[in-house]
């Protein structure tokens, strides 16, 4: 992940903090099964659009696979990162998107963690992933810290 390497180099030079979040659309399989894959694609676009509009300049988002996205929040402590992702959740749930003249409500669960010095990105992503699945297990449409 090039954006991670860039942010890690900045951290090594300047210090500071970096929060890493994983987002996963809730009930994505059911959405695809009930409304079709085009609805799933539209949900992914709605989430990506909300994230792009809501994040600060300098924050980064990328599709991570399936219905997951990774978010890098430079100069953001993990508690602030949790607040950023919670704001994203509110922004997404405040807007519905239309699919074949039907309003579709989409939510996502998130996990966020603090990058710890010289660790590999995979280690931070694993913590964020564990926090993401804690959010799913404990009710969905929420953010947990890992």
Residue ranges and their predicted role:
Residues 21-24, 66, 128:
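Conserved metal-coordinating catalytic motifs of nucleotidyl cyclase and c-di-GMP turnover enzymes
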Residues 78, 82, 86, 114-145:
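Catalytic-core segments of nucleotide cyclases and related cyclic-nucleotide turnover enzymes
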Residues 10, 53-58, 90-102, 132-134:
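Short catalytic/binding micro-motifs of nucleotide second-messenger systems
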Residues 63, 81, 92-108:
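Catalytic core regions of nucleotide second-messenger enzymes
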